[in-house]
Amino acid sequence: MFLTILAGLIAFAVTALAMPHFIRLYQLKKIGGQQMHEDVKQHLAKAGTPTMGGTVFLLVATSLSFVFALVYFRDGQSLGLISGILLIVLIYGIIGFLDDFLKIFKQVNEGLTAKQKFTLQIVGGLVFYVIHVMPSGIDAINVFGYHWHLGFLYLCFVLFWVVGFSNAVNLTDGIDGLASVSVVISLLAYGVIAYAQGQFDVLLLIGIMVGALLAFFLFNHKPAKIFMGDVGSLALGAMLAAISIALRQEWTLLVIGIVYVLETSSVMLQVTYFKYTKKKYGEGRRIFRMTPFHHHLELGGLSGKAAKWSEWKVDAFLWALGLVASLIVLAILYL
């Protein structure tokens, strides 16, 4: 535990020191920043805010993790597990970096196409499966102690899990501080699970990433000086999925990650309902005022009769939801 706390503090300090330089470099180069959605007028003032801040905390977290792992976890099993998780984080970080790079530096509005991004995400999931899952012989989902053996279909599950949650965290990263703190809450919950299982190698990775993310939040809370970009959100979602698999507690991510599930479900429901009503009635209708769900809250709270919610209020509501969900999972597992 001391090692994890020490590593987390170092990650916090290095990220906190590096981030201002990254922001300053971004501004000096006069690089085009984040584009804002016009439907949420309070966001228009953020246009041009530097993005790709995930580059900093990912480089810090992965570098420190490799160093600490090589020094303190020299056995093949721990190194294999740590390498598998870090590799998928790096791969998804690179995918996000390419997407951000095309949007900002090459002025390609959509960045990578949906097909390109999905293909690269599948490749990243396959790498994780080959490096970590196959050598461990895992082919079952653990649900409340009952193991559902899937055989080859477990590969499909791993790909679905990693790709799905990487995109879910990406959707969550829509207002200042929401994704960064939500992921910290999720990681802390998995830190408790890792500690209870004696998985101190995974606990180390969690501690380092939590430290780096808390430092990033110093610059990402409202009003944000920088956004994490796809480079950060895609990598964090993949990391959460990989950790839930590594700890053999896959189902818990549906609850611990309730915020990401809610954000993604809102988009899927909105699109499906809009297409259905357009076909049936000749005009598309909506369930939510705007998706992902955090924008629905911004534009009128839960009931729609309330005044527009501030970003801090939306953040607080969704952070609290994630915290309560995480505590419920821990209570189910250990009480």
UniProtKB/Swiss-Prot annotation:
Domain of life, per the record? Bacteria
A Gene Ontology BP annotation from the UniProt entry: peptidoglycan biosynthetic process
Top-level class of the enzyme under EC nomenclature: transferase
The transmembrane residues are 3-23, 53-73, 78-98, 118-138, 143-163, 174-194, 200-220, 226-246, 251-271, 314-334
Query: Quick one: a GO cellular component term?
Result: plasma membrane
Question: What InterPro entries does the record point to?
Answer: Glycosyl_transferase_4, PNAcMuramoyl-5peptid_Trfase, PNAcMuramoyl-5peptid_Trfase_CS
Spell out the Pfam families in the cross-references: Glycos_transf_4, MraY_sig1
Provide the catalytic activity annotation: UDP-N-acetyl-alpha-D-muramoyl-L-alanyl-gamma-D-glutamyl-L-lysyl-D-alanyl-D-alanine + di-trans,octa-cis-undecaprenyl phosphate = Mur2Ac(oyl-L-Ala-gamma-D-Glu-L-Lys-D-Ala-D-Ala)-di-trans,octa-cis-undecaprenyl diphosphate + UMP
The way this protein sits in the membrane is described as: Multi-pass membrane protein
Provide the primary localization: membrane
Enzyme Commission identifier(s): 2.7.8.13
Q: Which UniProt keywords apply?
A: Cell cycle, Cell division, Cell membrane, Cell shape, Cell wall biogenesis/degradation, Magnesium, Membrane, Metal-binding, Peptidoglycan synthesis, Transferase, Transmembrane, Transmembrane helix
One annotated GO molecular function is: metal ion binding
Compartments (UniProt record):
Cell membrane
Q: In which pathway does it act?
A: Cell wall biogenesis; peptidoglycan biosynthesis
Q: Which cofactor does it need?
A: Mg(2+)
**Similarity field:** Belongs to the glycosyltransferase 4 family. MraY subfamily.
For this protein, the record's HAMAP family field holds: MraY
Functionally, this protein is described as follows: Catalyzes the initial step of the lipid cycle reactions in the biosynthesis of the cell wall peptidoglycan: transfers peptidoglycan precursor phospho-MurNAc-pentapeptide from UDP-MurNAc-pentapeptide onto the lipid carrier undecaprenyl phosphate, yielding undecaprenyl-pyrophosphoryl-MurNAc-pentapeptide, known as lipid I.
What PANTHER family does the annotation carry? Answer: PHOSPHO-N-ACETYLMURAMOYL-PENTAPEPTIDE-TRANSFERASE (PTHR22926), PHOSPHO-N-ACETYLMURAMOYL-PENTAPEPTIDE-TRANSFERASE HOMOLOG (PTHR22926:SF5)
Q: Which protein, by its recorded name, is this?
A: Phospho-N-acetylmuramoyl-pentapeptide-transferase
Please name the source species: Streptococcus equi subsp. zooepidemicus (strain MGCS10565)
